[in-house]
Amino acid sequence: VLAEKRSLGSRDGPPHLVVLVPLHSKAAAHNTLRLLQSQDSAVVRVDEGKAGGFALLCPRLKQRWRFVTAEAGDLHAVLDLAKVADSLLFILDPADGWDSAGEHCLSCLFAQGLPSYALAVPGGTDLPPKKRIDARKKLARAIEKRFPDAKLFPLTTEQESSLLLRHLATQKQRHLAFRDRRAHLLAYAAEFVPGEESDLVGTLKVSGFVRGQTLDVNSLVHIVGHGDFQMSQVDSPPDPLSLNPRVIKGQKRSQDMEVQDDSVNGTDEMEEDVKVLMKADPNKQESLQSEVVPDPMEGEQTWPTEEELQEAE
C-alpha cells in the first residue's frame, strides 16, 4: 500500500488522474479549476482543445496530477472516465448538494464500482452566515447517507485547495477488480496514419500512461465505442508531463506560477526519441475472431455399418 501511494503521481509513476464530476446544475466546476490552478511554485499544462483539462506539476511536493472535467449530463462519459480514474472529485452545490441528475449519476457509479473519491463544495460565501450554517448541516446529513465516512472540503481559498490536493495524494486507493485485472489508459494524444491501400484503414497511434496490469503487445486492445483491435508495437515516447519541465528564460519558476499551453501536439512528441519496447509476434497474437464459425458438415451423419447394427440389436 505504501509503495502504491509513493508511485502514484510521482516521477516514476503515472500522473494522479482526477476526474471532476459536477453533481448539480449549479455546481461551480470552473471555480474549482481556477483554485486548483493557483498553486504556488506549480506548473500548469493546459490540454489544448479539451475544455477543463489540465495537468498540475508540483516539483516541490514531487507530485503531478492530471485533471479532466466530465461533461455534465453525459452519463456514459462519466462512467467511462470513472473506469480509468485514480480519484473522482465530486463538485457539490453549497445549498442542495446534488440534484436528481446527480443522484442518478451516483447510483450508476456505485453500481459500476466507485474508485477513490473526494467531496468538494466551491462557493457558498454569498449566503448569509446563518443560512450558511444551516446549509452546511443540511449538506452533512445528505452526505452521511451516501458517503458515511467522507470528509467535505470547502473550496473558497487557495489554502483550502492545497488541503484538497494533499488529501487526494495521500488517501488510500480503492481497488476495483475489473480494472486491476487489465491494463488501461486514458489517451493523452492520438493520431491516425492511413494505410497505403485505403484511407479508411490504417494505424492508430495512441499515447497515454498505462495503469493496472502490464500491457501485452500480443493481446487485444478495446477502444470504447469502436471495438477490439490488434496492436503492432508498443513504444516509449518522452514523458510529456515531466516533473522537471522546460523553464523559459527570464522567468522565476520558484516564485511565479507558470502556465504552459500544449501548443505542440502530443503526437509530435511521440516521434522524438521514441524507443520501441515490444513488437507483436504474429504467431502469438490473440485472434480477433470472437465467435465460432459454423461448419455445415459438422452435423452430418453416415449410415451405420452391419457390425454397428448388430451391436445395437
Locate the predicted segments by residue.
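Canonical P-loop GTPase G-domain recognition
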Residues: 110-217, 222
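C-terminal effector/interaction modules appended to NTPase cores
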Residues: 1-86, 196-313
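A generic secondary-structure signal
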Residues: 35, 39, 107-108, 142
